[in-house]
Amino acid sequence: MHIAVAVSGGTDSLFALLQVLEAGHQVTALHAHFLSPHDTPETTAHNTQAIEKACRALGADFHVEDLSAAFRKHVIEPFIDAYRQGRTPNPCARCNASMKFGLLADTARKLGAQAIATGHYARLQPDLPRPGNTVSLWRGDDPAKDQSYFLSLVPQHRLACAVFPLGGWRKQDVRAHLKQRGIVPPLPSESQEICFIPGDDYRAYLTAHAAGLPGAGPMVLRDGHVVGHHNGLWQYTEGQRRGLGIAWSEPLYVLEKDVSRNALVVGTRKQLTARGCRCVGVNTLVPPDQWPDAVYVKTRYRQTMIAAQVTPDADGADTMRVIFAASHTPPAAGQVAAVYDAAGRVLAGGIIASVF
């Protein structure tokens, strides 16, 4: 099988390339320029040359594709718009759905590949594409690195052409295997949380790149009592305690962002609860009539799965309503809610639109 392997130059993607090569497939190493030099000084010709050298040394053909304009349109601009609307977006999940398994996968097909492999820590069954087959997405075997949450928005037909060689590996074993083989990744450091934001400082990035962000407004309790002023809703996240600048009899937390009033609603730890959330843009990987009675959700990446009741809304097939089995810390609107069964199979994923 001809498989394109998405390579960034890091440990995980280089190991994925090695695994696919050693399995005997025809391989093209596919490197995407998602960021232009205007977005980051780290995207340089030197890095690309180093990545190409490493890939060719392993015996793979190498191809570079400039997708920076599309990345700005499909990932960066929606990221900025979400903050303008008082939401906390998840650009990595959007990138997986629209870029890595969207436009980059399209590039792979144009190069003659039947599948695209990446360095994600997640599993697919079956593990190799088979014509006409549907696939199921599962949590990776390394609980500390599992990335199925970020993949829950990738459509079924895209996953059907994907390969995840790292799904059954743990990160420390990946590093050890490369070291044993004497293979040094050209960009060996861990990738930052959001690739287009230097130092993961989203506030500095938005200040420099986003016009029209909402300004200061009142900070209020649930009863409407004003206890202070915030510096712009985009600078806060639900559940946040630090940085509120309020002297109160007990610690206060961000309960919600009232965009209509440009008000930041705060309250005590006891008030920091939610019964559920409503999601839009739902990507269904397993038909709901095939779901087990017991399902679970994750509304944050490093969160343990929590029991919930999940049902499609009556107003459309791409929405769903999530009711937590027990009161839960409010998730942030704009984040992903991924639905699982008890064994770790991903059933669906959607964008949190509102919390109640």
Swiss-Prot record:
Annotated disulfide bonds? C95-C195
Q: What EC number(s) would the UniProt record show? A: 2.8.1.13
What reactions does this protein catalyze? Answer: S-sulfanyl-L-cysteinyl-[protein] + uridine(34) in tRNA + AH2 + ATP = 2-thiouridine(34) in tRNA + L-cysteinyl-[protein] + A + AMP + diphosphate + H(+)
One MF annotation (Gene Ontology) recorded for this entry? ATP binding
Site Interaction with tRNA — annotated at H120, Q335
The UniProt annotation puts the region (Interaction with tRNA) at 145-147, 300-301
List the PANTHER family: MITOCHONDRIAL TRNA-SPECIFIC 2-THIOURIDYLASE 1 (PTHR11933:SF5), TRNA 5-METHYLAMINOMETHYL-2-THIOURIDYLATE -METHYLTRANSFERASE (PTHR11933)
Name this protein carries in UniProt: tRNA-specific 2-thiouridylase MnmA
